[in-house]
Curated annotation (Swiss-Prot):
The keyword Secreted applies. It comes from Mycolicibacterium smegmatis (strain ATCC 700084 / mc(2)155). The antigen 85 proteins (FbpA, FbpB, FbpC) are responsible for the high affinity of mycobacteria for fibronectin, a large adhesive glycoprotein. They also help to maintain the integrity of the cell wall by catalyzing the transfer of mycolic acids to cell wall arabinogalactan and through the synthesis of alpha,alpha-trehalose dimycolate (TDM, cord factor). They catalyze the transfer of a mycoloyl residue from one molecule of alpha,alpha-trehalose monomycolate (TMM) to another TMM, leading to the formation of TDM. Disulfide bonds join 127-132. One of its GO terms (molecular function) is diacylglycerol O-acyltransferase activity. Its EC number is 2.3.1.122, 2.3.1.20. It catalyses: 2 alpha,alpha'-trehalose 6-mycolate = alpha,alpha'-trehalose 6,6'-bismycolate + alpha,alpha-trehalose; an acyl-CoA + a 1,2-diacyl-sn-glycerol = a triacyl-sn-glycerol + CoA. Residues 98-108 are annotated as: Fibronectin-binding. It is found in: Secreted. Substrate binds at residues 82-83, 166, 274-277, 304-306. This is Diacylglycerol acyltransferase/mycolyltransferase Ag85B.
Amino acid sequence: MTFIDKIRGHWARRMTVAAVAALLLPGLVGVVGGSATAGAFSRPGLPVEYLMVPSPSMGRDIKVQFQSGGPGSHAVYLLDGLRAQDDFNGWDINTNAFEMFLDSGLSVVMPVGGQSSFYSDWYQPACGNNGCVTYKWETFLTSELPEWLAANRDVAATGNAAIGLSMAGSAALILAAYHPDRFIYAGSMSGFLNPSEGWWPFLINISMGDAGGYKANDMWGPTEDPNSAWKRNDPMVQIPRLVANNTRIWVYCGNGQPNELGGGDLPATFLEGLTIRTNETFRDNYIAAGGNNGVFNFPNNGTHNWAYWGRELQAMVPDLQRVLG
C-alpha cells in the first residue's frame, strides 16, 4: 500500500465516522442513557425517600432518591445516563430497581441530575443551554454523599457499589479505581470503556452538546493537552488500579441485535454495536493484567435500551448481596 493509499484510507475512515455521526447522533444522544420505558416506576408504597443532600463542592443541594436496606447496611449507588433528568433518576423512571432491592439488606442510592457530567469533577464550570453550574460529581459521590448518608441514614460509608449505564458505566469503574475504600464493587452496562481512544472524544463532545449544550473540553480539557483528564477518566487506562484494588467488577454489553425485550430502533442498535468493541477489549486487557475478580456478560443480543439494563441489574442482585454483605 502506498503512502497516498494510506492517507486516503485514513481520511476515508474519518469521513465515514463523521458522516455516521452527523446522520445518527441526533437520534443516538436521545438514547444515550437509554430509550425510556413508560410506566416503569417502582410500585407505590415502597419506602423511598427524596433527600436533599448538601454539596459544598457544587454549591447547592443535590436531590437523591433513597431506599434503606436497614441500619448499617451497605449501599448500591445507581448512576444515570447522559440525559439524566433533574426530577427523577433514570433507574427509577425506567426500571423497578427499588423493588429489586426491597428486603435485600442493601440500601439503594440514586443521585438525581448530572446531565452529560460523566459523574466527574470538571476542569471548568459546566456551561450549557441553561447557563453554568459547577460539576464536582466525583467529590460528591465519594465524599459528601457517603458521609452525609452515614451521619443521617446510618448507611455504611465504605464498602459500597457503584453501577451505571452508558456514560455512567465508565464513571462507575473510575470511581472504584480511585476510591477503593468507598466502592469495592463497580458495574458497567453498555459503558464507554475507552473514552480517550481515537474518535470517542469527538463523539462524546457531539453527544454532550446535544444533551444540554455542554462541551467535553470543559469537562476534561483538550485531548491534545498532556495535562488533560481524558486518560485519568479512561477505564481502559486504569485497569491496573482496578486489578490492584481487587475491585469486584461486572461488565455487560450487548451486540446491537434486539431480542424479545425490543429496542430495535436504529440508534439503540447502532450505539450498542459500536460500544461492544471497547468492552471486549477491556475484558481482554483486564485478564491479561492479572484481573480475576470480574464478571463479563456479552450475550449475542442486546441494544442500548433500559429493558436490557433492568434485566442485567436484576441478575446482579445476588452477587451484590454476596460481595457487599
